[in-house]
């Protein structure tokens, strides 16, 4: 039968389209990671795994930040990011979307939910929560130790940070990644990255990074 999707190419039950999108429990997909068959007890035990990865992005201001600012836009960039792809739910293998003939569904993702967002207090933060298509991040061509770029428009001025690839090397299915940015003026002053098993583990021992403001 045809999978219930607008894509008419999917006539195979095991191949499902995926979209990077705002987190919604109803949009999650699962696949059988492994199964055990017990012939004596006549049962099959299946172990399901999240097909998607998940990214939570927090943006706030430093305690000493004196002014109000607006988060106008947020974008993620890496050559290996997927906006659309397909997954074989029998194996968990992610593949290129059949309509992605010119890489039009790869390379970046613009976050739109809740934007623009006014930051008028250190107690407030903008948060984006995304279902991400699993992928191995590629090193930045100019800074090979870094991978995922986060570009934030702060009150009309762009600022960017590139996360060290040793700390965030991929978006793995079934894992949640938390990236927290702190603003000082129109620069991203600090970044922390945490990964969880949807079981938190602090990356880089919680040390903030010094990102590159974008001129």
Regions found by a protein language model. Give the residues of each.
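Extended, solvent-exposed segments with strong compositional bias
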Residues: 98-130
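Edge beta-strands of extracellular beta-sandwich domains
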Residues: 159-167
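Short, ordered, surface-exposed loop/turn motifs in non-cytosolic proteins
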Residues: 64-106
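Residue-level recognition of well-ordered beta-strand positions that form the cores
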Residues: 58-60, 75, 151-153, 182
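Short Pro-Gly-centered beta-turn/loop motif in secreted/extracellular proteins
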Residues: 126-146
